[in-house]
Amino acid sequence: MCGRTACTLAPDDVRKACTYRDKQGGRKWPNWRDGDSDKYQPSYNKSPQSNSPVLLSLKHFQKDADSSERVLAAMRWGLIPSWFNEPDPSKMQYKTNNCRSDTMTEKALYKASLFKGKRCVVLADGFYEWQRQNSEKQPYYIYFPQIKAEKSPAEQDITDWNGQRLLTMAGLFDCWEPPNGGETLYSYTVITVDSSKTMNWIHDRMPAILDGDEAVRKWLDFGEVPTKDALKLIHPIENITYHPVSTVVNNSRNNTPECMAAIILTQKKGPALSASSKKMLDWLQNKSPKKEESHSIQSPKLSQFGAPPKKTSAGLMQQWLKKEDGEPSPKRAKK
């Protein structure tokens, strides 16, 4: 599951971190939807019902746009379906911050968004997950490995981004019109899958992470990539890393660098951190997220540890994909 994230980049840096190639091969930065850059507030500790930066096809807002063009929007975390008829979205009785991949083709909460092509990419520095240890829970911060490609000045492009690589999580969104009138609310849910071997010792679920711009392109381009093909992108990945963090992150009101700073666990809980992790801790203690300030957080790559449990089954989504591809569904053995 995914119930807490960090997104600390200033709005303009979010744009730069989302650089992509258009159909002509040129590199571009997506623009923010009008007014949305002001709705997004950088934070070390984002929880459901807050606004997060979301990447989606521009065609959702401009019908004459190409579906491959991208735009940034600030959306509420926790999907409110268009058919919800209460005047207050906080009255929503279901938790919709996460959407299980194995049931989203069946559940009324999500299948309309899925089959109408309302696919989005939720952006974050990383997310937090809690590993249960007897009666206690140890939080971990999980993110993409930060590997910088060295380029000569001649190879540099104005659109090149040299900061951290943002985590790109597959999501679904919807737009809700208040029954008594008012501003349209855009909201999203993060799709989750069975955890990969890299992190299933921490938790048995993880976000569906899109690793690389080609995966992001296919997920966003609903005009060119049909649902059944897009769903093939929804699976666990191993290309992530993590480190333990302080329990200060447990309280969503805490919004300080300490939330995502690496800590040293006792030998019973895990290995000591490397010198680079300690350096990161010192760096974070002198930083705070500011909208007017451009900065990035360099995260250390740590070794994985802990014995992973067995994976669970893929579920209904894989059965649906096989049916769409003309493959026979597996029959249950007779008892």
Swiss-Prot record:
Residues 24-39, 321-335 have a biased composition (Basic and acidic residues). The active site is at 2 (nucleophile), 129. GO terms for cellular component: replication fork. Formation and reversal of DNA-protein cross-link depends on DNA context. Catalyzes formation of the thiazolidine linkage in presence of abasic sites in single-stranded DNA. Mediates the reversal of the thiazolidine cross-link in presence of double stranded DNA. The record marks 203 as: Required to stabilize abasic sites. It comes from Xenopus tropicalis. The record marks 129 as: Required for sensing abasic sites. Residues 40-51 have a biased composition (Polar residues). Coiled coil: none annotated. Sensor of abasic sites in single-stranded DNA (ssDNA) required to preserve genome integrity by promoting error-free repair of abasic sites. Acts as an enzyme that recognizes and binds abasic sites in ssDNA at replication forks and chemically modifies the lesion by forming a covalent cross-link with DNA: forms a stable thiazolidine linkage between a ring-opened abasic site and the alpha-amino and sulfhydryl substituents of its N-terminal catalytic cysteine residue. The hmces DNA-protein cross-link is then either reversed or degraded. It comes from the Eukaryota. Belongs to the SOS response-associated peptidase family. Keywords: Autocatalytic cleavage, Chromosome, Covalent protein-DNA linkage, DNA damage, DNA-binding, Hydrolase, Lyase, Protease, Ubl conjugation. The N-terminal catalytic Cys-2 residue forms a thiazolidine linkage to a ring-opened DNA abasic site. Glu-129 catalyzes reversal of the thiazolidine linkage; self-reversal is favoured by duplex DNA formation. Glu-129 is also involved in sensing abasic sites in single-stranded DNA (ssDNA). His-203 stabilizes the abasic sites by forming a hydrogen bond with the O4' hydroxyl group. This is Abasic site processing protein HMCES. It holds the Pfam family SRAP. Ubiquitination of the hmces DNA-protein cross-link by rfwd3 may promotes its degradation. GO terms for biological process: DNA damage response; positive regulation of isotype switching; protein-DNA covalent cross-linking repair; proteolysis. Residues 24-51, 284-335 are annotated as: Disordered. GO terms for molecular function: peptidase activity; protein-DNA covalent cross-linking activity; single-stranded DNA binding. Its EC number is 4.-.-.-, 3.4.-.-. It is found in: Chromosome.
